[in-house]
């Protein structure tokens, strides 16, 4: 007994240490109750998962103990029959072992993928597929060794309990999800059935069938391979008791299969059938009746096996099952060819209408406000006056060139990294009713970029603990050398905060709107190891010339490790014994865990799907609740987007072949303190049934979006990832008439443009513009659209970002009877212009490279303005400099060093004086400056 206790001690210590660290980590947010609920749910479902395992063990023990004489009237099982029994039971044993072990691995690594592991064709990760030979080898050897086979059976029992326990989110969602109030027309179920309940029922039935099949196969194989049956290749017929007991096992499995077949009727609702997303005429009138009949026959077959055993009636029912499958497989293509195809539109129109309506609802396209506009042919002075707010914020700097410049001018040390640049708006001009568009980029510490000799344990976890600062540059201007004009740059005591005379921005207004001092970033986008702070070791804060400035963390984040017990738990949790031996730890030391923002959120809310990169905001104010860090006010926060999604939403079309989502909501905005690591989760889609379920389960975790501080709410952005999905679905589902949808003659596409010599799709971009009917300008996310296989501009979709109208979608249709030039056509006109082409050719060569930036289509008054920035950089690692702006109104083209000058040329219709004042010497000088 003592020996057993010593063996048990290490795993118990590991479990206790992990539970302690997790509990304390959740306690820093006052969310211990969330962790406790999750533990209790997993314990509850582990108990529920143990019930079928316990019943299977009882059944196996009872079957193995039966020693009744063979039935004399039955002939022995030999020859081909023996081979068939041996092959079927062996293959079933192997297949169930592999699937159950794969599910256990998936449950351990990605438990929230269990809900769609099969219904959406979930494929195991490649590293798990590499385990297949090992799994087959172990299961194969166990077939030959009874003792090993029993251990495999025990392992499969644990695997089943693990899967059921780790799938707590699947079962909880199914139990708590409210009705949406909308019903699908085929089976009459509420649409919430597909969002939550279907996956849970399917997973439960699949696990029961897998475990039942494994148990039955294990029992049959054990009986068949008992000596001397295998050597004789024959065995006597089973006795009456054994036969009845085996019939009960087979019948139970058949009941599970019947349930899966009955449930598969719902799968017709979210499988694409030709043009119809969901069940069409053929599925309703042929597939559905056959599946219902098949489920009924399997149900009768299963019940009869349990009640009467396997006999002539059961064999007849089995033949009926085969006949139903064959008849359906034969009739389906015949009916499609002879009945549906000749009158497809008439038969499918009601189903197409349902699919259009459901797809639009699944991706919130039904919220779109649609308007029609007819832009003027020429850009006029009146347009410039009414569109002044738009022209003041035209984005001339793309993220790519700006990040390149940041990395060369602002990283300052090899271990700093600018991984993302986000477009945002800040009130930098107090008297203006329009916020200034800027690009903000965080300077994070990249541990992987440390020199090899510097990658010591102490450096990685005690010294290089955080990034520092950020850059802010207006989107619509450049410096005298063509480089970005920063209003905030550099870091630490050398942080430069500047105004911009051309834009009317004053330094004091920048300081008031964007706090930049003490901007230590302990939590960020980049993966970071744990950090131990504060300690006896000085933390690197920032470089100051040739010297380094050091600091100590003064926040409240982290798990305390001041006492010996706390250090022991942390060292076990992190598998790091050096935490016990180092002398750098002091009484108030803590270990910062999960410092990557998305990892941090997933630990708290694993049911949220996090897409896209979090973006940094820096805001004034000392009453943000989650922003206080000891005696220090923290102003930098990360905002991340949390989604709820489903691949089983009735009659909704999937996004693509690789993205099976049929329902998507940007339901949660997560704000993370960049210094203190505190988090708040704000519900931005309170009507979403899925997020309602999680609010019921964890009410302490969520807040309404109305409770978000206004200073943060002013920086909310419609996420580009969500917007792109909506644009993708809109390309076909902007049509609401089934006849037009069926004809396919009004399909849209995202236009193409040439960027850096490569043809790419036009990305969504932000503009500040005044919507018709509004008195003030708004911050919009815009996507131009063109007809399929035609370059003319047909529409654009705009997402509104400002608080009052946040998330509203506006679709602007352009006239079909007059061609409006699209981005691809305008770019072709620019490149074909002889004067422009001459200048471009002059720059693009001799060690320099010309890059035509993103072409923007902007509403200016009642006209359209096309704007394309032009960058010049050295071929090998040069700084991209903004050298020219090309503009067009669809008729004329003009180019100059800044936007206002280029527009002035366009309005005055100056005959292509685009090289005026730009001598070859100046071009050479620009090239040299870029190269240097």
Swiss-Prot record:
Which cysteines are disulphide-bonded?
none
Please give, as recorded in its UniProt entry, the membrane topology of this protein: Multi-pass membrane protein
Q: Please name one Pfam family that this protein belongs to.
A: UPF0182
Tell me where it resides: Cell membrane
Its transmembrane ranges are: 4-24, 40-60, 85-105, 124-144, 151-171, 201-221, 243-263, 293-313, 315-335
- One GO CC annotation, please? extracellular region
Per UniProt, the keywords (alphabetical) are:
Cell membrane, Membrane, Transmembrane, Transmembrane helix
Where it mainly occurs, coarsely classed, is: membrane
InterPro entries documented for this protein: UPF0182
Give the highest taxon in the source lineage: Bacteria
- Report the family membership: Belongs to the UPF0182 family.
- PANTHER family the UniProt entry points to: UPF0182 PROTEIN SLL1060
Protein name, per record: UPF0182 protein Syncc9902_1151
Q: What is the lineage of its organism?
A: Bacteria, Bacillati, Cyanobacteriota, Cyanophyceae, Synechococcales
């Amino acid at each position: 007994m003592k020996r057993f206790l010593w063996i048990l001690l290490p795993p118990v210590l590991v479990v206790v240490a992990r539970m302690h660290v997790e509990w304390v980590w959740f306690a820093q947010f006052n969310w211990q109750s969330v962790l406790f609920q999750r533990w209790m749910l997993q314990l509850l479902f582990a108990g529920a998962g143990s019930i079928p395992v316990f019943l299977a063990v009882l059944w196996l023990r009872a079957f193995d103990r039966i020693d009744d004489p063979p039935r004399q009237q039955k002939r022995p099982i030999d020859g081909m029959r023996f081979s068939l029994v041996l092959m079927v039971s062996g293959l079933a044993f192997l297949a169930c072992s592999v699937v159950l072990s794969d599910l256990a691995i998936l449950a351990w690594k990605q438990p929230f993928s269990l809900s769609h592991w099969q219904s959406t064709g979930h494929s195991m990760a490649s590293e798990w597929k590499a385990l297949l030979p090992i799994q087959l080898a172990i299961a194969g050897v166990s077939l030959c060794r009874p003792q090993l086979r029993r251990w495999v059976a025990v392992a499969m029992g644990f695997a089943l309990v693990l899967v059921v326990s780790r799938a707590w989110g699947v079962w909880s969602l199914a139990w708590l999800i409210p009705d949406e109030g909308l019903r699908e027309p085929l089976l009459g179920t509420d649409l919430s059935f597909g969002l939550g309940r279907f996956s849970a029922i399917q997973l439960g039935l699949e696990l029961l069938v897998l475990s039942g099949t494994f148990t039955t196969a294990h029992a049959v194989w054990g009986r068949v391979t008992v000596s001397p049956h295998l050597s004789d290749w024959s065995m006597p017929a089973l006795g009456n008791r054994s036969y009845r007991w085996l019939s009960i096992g087979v019948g139970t499995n058949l009941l599970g299969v019947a349930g899966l077949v009955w449930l598969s009727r719902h799968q017709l609702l979210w499988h694409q059938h030709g043009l119809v997303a969901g069940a069409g005429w053929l599925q309703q009138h042929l597939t559905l009746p056959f599946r219902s009949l098949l489920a009924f026959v399997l149900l009768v077959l299963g019940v009869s096996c349990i009640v009467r055993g396997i006999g002539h009636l059961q064999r007849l029912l089995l033949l009926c099952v085969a006949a139903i499958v064959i008849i359906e497989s034969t009739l389906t293509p015949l009916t499609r060819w002879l009945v549906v195809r000749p009158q497809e539109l008439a038969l499918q129109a009601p189903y197409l209408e349902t699919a259009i309506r459901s797809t639009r609802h699944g991706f919130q396209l039904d919220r779109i406000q649609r308007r029609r506009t007819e832009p003027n042919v020429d850009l006029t002075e009146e347009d410039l006056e009414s569109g002044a707010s738009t022209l003041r914020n035209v984005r001339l700097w793309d993220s790519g060139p700006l990040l390149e410049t940041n990395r060369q001018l602002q990283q300052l040390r090899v271990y700093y990294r600018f991984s993302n640049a986000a477009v945002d708006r800040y009130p930098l001009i107090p008297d203006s009713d329009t916020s200034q568009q800027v690009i903000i980029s965080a300077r994070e510490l990249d541990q992987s970029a440390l020199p090899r000799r510097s990658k010591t344990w102490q450096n990685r976890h005690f010294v290089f603990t955080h990034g520092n600062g950020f850059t802010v540059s207006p989107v619509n201007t450049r410096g005298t050398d063509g480089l970005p004009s920063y209003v905030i740059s550099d870091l630490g005591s050398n942080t430069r905060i500047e105004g911009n005379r051309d834009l009317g921005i004053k330094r004091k207004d920048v300081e008031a709107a964007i706090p930049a001092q003490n901007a230590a970033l302990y939590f960020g986008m980049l993966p970071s190891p744990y950090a131990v702070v504060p300690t006896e070791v000085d933390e690197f804060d920032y470089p100051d010339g040739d010297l380094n400035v050091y600091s100590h963390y003064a926040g409240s984040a982290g798990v305390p490790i001041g006492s010996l017990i706390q250090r022991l738990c942390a060292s076990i949790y992190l598998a790091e014994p050096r935490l016990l031996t180092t002398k750098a730890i002091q009484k108030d030391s803590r270990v910062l865990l999960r410092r990557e923002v998305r990892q941090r959120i997933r630990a708290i809310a694993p049911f949220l799907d996090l897409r896209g990169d979090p973006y940094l905001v820096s805001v004034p104010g000392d009453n943000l609740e989650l922003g206080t860090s000891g005696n220090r006010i923290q102003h930098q926060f990360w905002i991340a987007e949390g989604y709820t999604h489903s691949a089983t939403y009735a009659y909704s079309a999937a996004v693509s072949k690789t993205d099976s989502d049929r329902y998507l909501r940007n339901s949660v905005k997560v704000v993370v303190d960049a210094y203190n690591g505190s988090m708040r989760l704000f519900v931005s889609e309170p009507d979403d049934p899925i997020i309602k379920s999680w609010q019921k389960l964890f009410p302490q975790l969520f807040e309404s979006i109305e409770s978000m501080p206004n200073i943060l709410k002013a920086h909310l952005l419609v996420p580009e990832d969500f917007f792109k999905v909506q644009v993708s679905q809109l390309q076909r589902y902007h049509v609401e008439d089934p006849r037009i949808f069926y004809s396919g003659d009004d399909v849209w596409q995202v236009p193409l443009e040439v960027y850096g010599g490569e043809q790419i799709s036009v990305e969504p971009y932000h503009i500040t513009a005044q919507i018709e009917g509004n008195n003030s300008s708004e911050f919009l996310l815009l996507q131009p659209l063109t007809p399929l296989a035609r370059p003319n501009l047909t529409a654009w979709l705009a997402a509104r970002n400002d608080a009052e109208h946040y998330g509203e979608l506006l679709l602007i249709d352009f006239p079909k009877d007059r061609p409006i030039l699209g981005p691809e056509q305008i770019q072709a006109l620019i490149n074909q212009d002889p004067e422009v082409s001459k200048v471009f050719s002059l720059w693009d060569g001799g060690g320099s490279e010309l890059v035509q930036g993103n072409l923007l289509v902007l509403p200016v008054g009642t006209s359209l303005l096309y704007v394309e920035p032009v960058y010049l950089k050295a071929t090998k690692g040069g700084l991209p400099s903004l050298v020219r702006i090309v503009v067009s109104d669809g008729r004329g083209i003009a180019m100059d060093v800044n936007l206002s000058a280029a527009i002035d040329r366009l309005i005055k219709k100056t005959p292509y004086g685009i090289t005026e004042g730009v001598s070859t010497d100046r071009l050479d000088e620009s090239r040299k400056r870029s190269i240097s």
